[in-house]
C-alpha cells in the first residue's frame, strides 16, 4: 500500500491557516513531524520560503523541567522578558494569580497543553505547525487558544478533529485520504 503522503503537493502562502483533515492513521501527524524535521521525508522534498521560522506543537506534549513552577518554565526559556510580560502571556492561557506558582509536575493534561502553547506563542515563529492543539482542553481553554491564534499574524498548519475549532480558525482545508 502506498502512503498517501507520497502524493502530497501543496503551496502554503503567508497568512494562511490550513486545517489538515483525514481519518486516523492516514499520516497527518507524520506530515507534521516531517515538516519540522523530526522524521525524514518518505519521498520528494519540501522547501520553506525565505526567513521562515517554525514553531511546533506536538500532541504528545513537551517535557517540562520537573520541580519548576509554571512561571519559571517560561522565564527560563525567555529570560529577556520581565515578570509582567511573562504573566501577561500566561494570563492569555488562563494561568492567573497563584496558578503561576504551581509546579509543572502537578498540572493536568489541559494545563500542560496551555503551558506548551504559551511557550510556543513566545517564540518568534512565523509559521506554526500544531498537531491536535485542542486535545485535553476544556471549552474555556479552547476559547483562549482560539483568541491567541486569531491574534496571530503568521501562517498556521494544524491537525484537528474538532469541527468547531476548524471552522473558527481555518481559511483552507487539506484533506488526506487513505
Task: Describe the predicted segments one by one.
Residues 1-178:
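ABC ATP-binding cassette signature C-motif
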Amino acid at each position: 500500500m502506498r502512503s498517501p503522503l507520497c502524493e502530497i503537493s501543496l503551496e502554503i502562502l503567508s497568512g494562511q491557516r490550513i486545517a489538515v483533515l483525514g481519518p486516523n492513521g492516514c499520516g497527518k501527524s507524520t506530515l507534521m513531524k516531517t515538516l519540522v524535521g523530526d522524521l525524514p521525508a518518505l519521498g520528494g522534498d519540501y522547501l520553506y520560503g525565505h526567513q521562515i521560522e517554525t514553531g511546533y506543537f506536538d500532541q504528545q506534549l513537551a517535557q517540562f523541567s520537573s520541580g519548576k513552577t509554571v512561571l519559571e518554565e517560561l522565564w527560563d526559556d525567555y529570560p529577556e522578558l520581565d515578570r509582567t510580560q511573562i504573566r501577561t502571556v500566561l494570563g492569555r492561557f488562563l494561568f492567573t494569580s497563584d496558578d503561576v506558582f504551581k509546579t509543572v509536575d502537578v498540572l493536568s493534561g489541559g494545563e500542560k497543553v496551555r503551558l506548551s502553547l504559551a511557550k510556543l506563542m513566545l517564540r518568534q515563529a512565523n509559521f506554526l505547525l500544531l498537531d491536535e492543539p485542542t486535545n485535553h482542553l476544556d471549552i474555556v481553554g479552547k476559547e483562549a487558544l482560539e483568541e491567541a491564534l486569531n491574534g496571530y499574524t503568521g501562517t498556521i498548519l494544524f491537525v484537528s478533529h474538532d469541527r468547531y475549532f476548524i471552522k473558527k480558525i481555518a481559511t483552507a482545508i487539506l484533506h488526506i485520504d487513505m
